[in-house]
Curated annotation (Swiss-Prot):
Reaction equations catalysed: (R)-4'-phosphopantetheine + ATP + H(+) = 3'-dephospho-CoA + diphosphate
Residues annotated for ATP binding in this entry: 9-10, 17, 88-90, 98, 122-128
Organism: Flavobacterium johnsoniae (strain ATCC 17061 / DSM 2064 / JCM 8514 / BCRC 14874 / CCUG 350202 / NBRC 14942 / NCIMB 11054 / UW101)
TM annotation in the entry: none
GO molecular function, one term: ATP binding
InterPro entries: Cyt_trans-like, PPAT, Rossmann-like_a/b/a_fold
Stated name of the protein: Phosphopantetheine adenylyltransferase
Keywords, comma-separated and alphabetical: ATP-binding, Coenzyme A biosynthesis, Cytoplasm, Magnesium, Nucleotide-binding, Nucleotidyltransferase, Transferase
Similarity remark: Belongs to the bacterial CoaD family.
Residues annotated for substrate binding in this entry: 9, 41, 73, 87
Localization (cell): Cytoplasm
Cofactor field: Mg(2+)
Gene Ontology CC annotation, any one: cytoplasm
Length: 152
């Protein structure tokens, strides 16, 4: 079984995340969207809200499940018996950052990282940009799935 972990904080999930997941569905038998929890990080949306946004976005997709976790992604992948970590790349800076993590993960396990390039239409979107737009009362709706389109 080809099982992949798609990790992130998803604060909130964006159309870029959604695009990568949808394009990953034909590649894997199962995709586990793993919401990382970092006690030292301040989030705009609660863990419950972030999980609900993702579950609502993929409610009709049986190959997608959503979990939360603390600790190293590679440890979660092993625990979940996943052979792949799915990541999206928006730009060369993302690639350099993700490449170092992928090499480290490969040293620690047999788990492969699969990179998908973001679509040109979503490559400018990040959760931090969405949060900034929200904080300033801007129009954020075109950046996120329908499930997130609720003003804070």
């Amino acid at each position: 079984m080809r099982k992949a972990i798609f990790p992130g904080s998803f604060d909130p999930i964006t159309l870029g995340h959604e695009d990568i997941i949808k394009r990953g569905i034909p590649l894997f038998d199962e995709i586990v969207i793993a919401i990382g929890v970092n006690a030292e990080k301040k989030y705009m949306f609660s863990l419950e809200e972030r999980k609900r946004f993702i579950e609502e976005t993929f409610k009709d997709e049986p190959k997608v499940s959503v979990i939360t976790y603390e600790g190293l992604t590679i440890d979660l992948a092993k625990k979940q018996k996943a052979h792949f970590i799915l990541r999206g790349l928006r730009n060369p800076a993302d690639f350099e950052f993700e490449k170092a993590i992928a090499h480290t993960n490969r040293k620690l396990s047999k788990i492969e990282t699969v990179f998908l390039l973001t679509a040109a239409s979503t490559s400018f979107i990040s959760s931090s940009i969405v949060r900034d737009v929200l904080r300033h009362g801007g129009e954020y709706e075109m950046l996120v799935p329908d499930a997130v389109r609720v003003k804070k």
